[in-house]
């Protein structure tokens, strides 16, 4: 694949120990500016965390539909800066991120809408503000959620 990429005149970047999505997101953040808009062609929701005024996703699964901040919020129910916390709560099987048992996408986005970030959600659960089995799981699996955030 690297030879094919080079044959089309594109640079090929390899960084040992880093996944391609991490490298692409880092490059997008580094090069995006008032004068340069970065576009990431992907359907991977992990990339949503870097979307901002000068970085957009072209969702290949939706015919190249452009996704900015409002589209990420519509699709995932959270702002781009909350995507890592969303993944930490709900998990992501494609990236082996376990998340918290019993917390899916809707619950995770609702909790983040109420409390703002992962640590505030976990704090609210520890204080008994998140009721039932869900609250108990957030307390029991708090360290797993923190690990999931580092993995995301």
Where in this protein do the model-derived segments appear?
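Extended two-metal-dependent nuclease catalytic cores across DNA- and RNA-processing enzymes
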Residues: 1-152
């Amino acid at each position: 694949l690297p030879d094919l990429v080079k044959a089309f005149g594109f640079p090929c970047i390899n960084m040992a120990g880093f996944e391609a999505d991490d490298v692409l997101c880092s490059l997008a953040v580094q090069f995006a500016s008032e004068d340069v808009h970065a576009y990431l062609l992907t359907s991977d929701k992990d990339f949503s965390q870097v979307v901002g005024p000068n970085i957009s996703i072209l969702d290949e699964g939706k015919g190249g539909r452009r996704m900015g901040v409002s589209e990420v919020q519509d699709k995932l129910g959270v702002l781009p800066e909350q995507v890592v916390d969303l993944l930490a709560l709900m998990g992501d099987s494609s990236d082996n991120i376990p998340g918290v048992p019993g917390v899916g996408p809707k619950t995770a986005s609702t909790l983040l809408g109420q409390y703002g970030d992962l640590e505030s959600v976990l704090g609210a659960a520890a204080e008994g503000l998140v009721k039932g089995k869900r609250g108990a799981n957030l307390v029991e699996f708090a360290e797993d959620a923190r690990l999931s955030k580092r993995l995301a």
